[in-house]
Amino acid sequence: MNKLLKLLFISAFFNALCWMILIPIWQYPDEQAHFAQVQNVAELGKVRTVGNDTSYEIALSEKILGTDRNGFGNNKYTYHPEYNIPYSDNAVGLFEGEISNLPRLSKTNLVKDEATVNPPLYYFLGSIAYKLAYNGILFDRVFSVRLMSALIFMGTVFLSFKIGQIIFEKEKLLAITLASLIAFKPMLTFTSTGVLPDTLTNFLFSFILYLSLKILKDGIKFSTLVLISLAVVMGISTRQQFLISTFIVSMALFYQIYRNPKYTKHFVLSILAFALFIYISNTFLINLPFFTNFRVPEIFDTGFLKFDEISFAAFITHLVWTIRHTYSEVWPWYWGVYKWHSLTLPPVYYQVINRLVLVGILGLVIKLILIFRKRETDKRTIYFFFLLASSLIYFLVLTIWDYIFFIGHGFSFGIQGRYFFPLVIAHVAILLMGFWQLFKIFLKNYAKLGLVTLAFLMIVFNDLSLFHIAGSYYDTSSLEIFIAQASQYKPLFVKSNTILFTLTLNIGFQLLLIFYLIKNAIRQTN
């Protein structure tokens, strides 16, 4: 099993490399704005909050690459999935030299306002990766930060395996399957391999999920609480939505306190101390650098003292709208929307996904019936309901936050599918439990071959998605033209034969992984 796990990580890493290489520069969500903040931290030692904050180097590259926004916030790709920049007939882009030959001053000559002003942790780490390629051209530095994001994603894949070990206990193949589904989920890989803080948010949230499950399994330990505190501080220093994680941790703590009431006093004091800290951070310490990361403007600026504007009926209306919006728009985004939200996957992909998810839900219904019929209260059942409750709480808190935002601004913030990725391991694990329930009933001794089939389908979905996206950017009519176009506006070490070599290794490791998954499943079947 250890060899299989190592093979999974190698395969997942090369898959992430392929996404990094084939996705053109500035084609991840707001990548140029996130990179501008990384560049400011690396070059200026601070985040610009007043005046221009984006370098001439980035601005010029945006104009050349078609991602420069107009007055409405749109670029040439927005609403136009057919658009592409003009390509040359070799591995060097038509205007690649203009970007590569810019003077050093172009990195600090700020010409427009576009950089993000997000909490600092990801950008601090990104600045380290940036400096590792400091003397390189723009493409070198972007890919250095992308590689850092991909390595963090490998940490998320590892955590998915560790979480699988807890919730599936002795069923090791289930843990490997969960990690495989996470490693090759295409939209997750996409958002985890660009210059954006999602990958760190997802990793830290997954770590919180893992520690919460450890509390359910082993009880409350001081070392676990220290790690949780550290993860929460790091998470809030990455994304402010990370505050939601405190609700999830609290559930695990509540469970242990219910079993051991002696912890009640310490828990209540901790909750009061945390609430007081949030209040002070949002009132008296709001202008201090570290404490601004804990700011909750939707509560303290618009809704906290305006209870007359909050209506239960209006919230229910907003909740119903959110559920419909989630099904019609957010759900497809969860599985894949690319190219500045202009490119979706072929409809048949979503149709297959929806039917498979319905099969998984059927398995969950059967599982719930069996749990209540047998009155099961074992650890696996506790883990199942914890993951289910965590997912529902996350959705509800996000909906309440969006409702408060709506009160203050008159419109919804606009929830995207990737906003739910912090709990993607929980979502996939829940569905996997449903499938496993069905496999045990209908496949009996061959149930583990069903698990391999799921992993195989996700890998195929990943490859088809990447091919579909790459085909929207590059001419795939011949391998020579495809490699030439994919090489343009990339670092020197990510051109021509390097691309072909990486793609070949990726397919090879995927085939090896599938082979050994099948071999392992057959061995356990016998």
Residue ranges and their predicted role:
Residues 224-240, 245:
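Membrane-interface alpha helices of multi-pass inner-membrane proteins
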Residues 277-278, 305-307, 313, 445-526:
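Transmembrane helical bundles and short interhelical boundary loops of multi-pass, membrane-embedded
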Residues 211-217, 245-276, 369:
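Perimembrane helix-loop-helix junctions
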Residues 144-168, 207:
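Transmembrane-helix motifs of polytopic, lipid-linked glycan transferases
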Residues 286-371, 486-503:
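Membrane-lumen/periplasm interface segments of multi-pass, membrane-embedded glycan/lipid transferases
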Residues 45-145, 302-306, 336, 341-343:
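Interfacial juxtamembrane loops and adjacent helix segments
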Residues 6, 139, 160-184, 446-449:
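Transmembrane-helix signature of polytopic, membrane-embedded enzymes
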Residues 168, 208-224:
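Membrane-interface transmembrane helices that cradle and orient dolichyl/undecaprenyl
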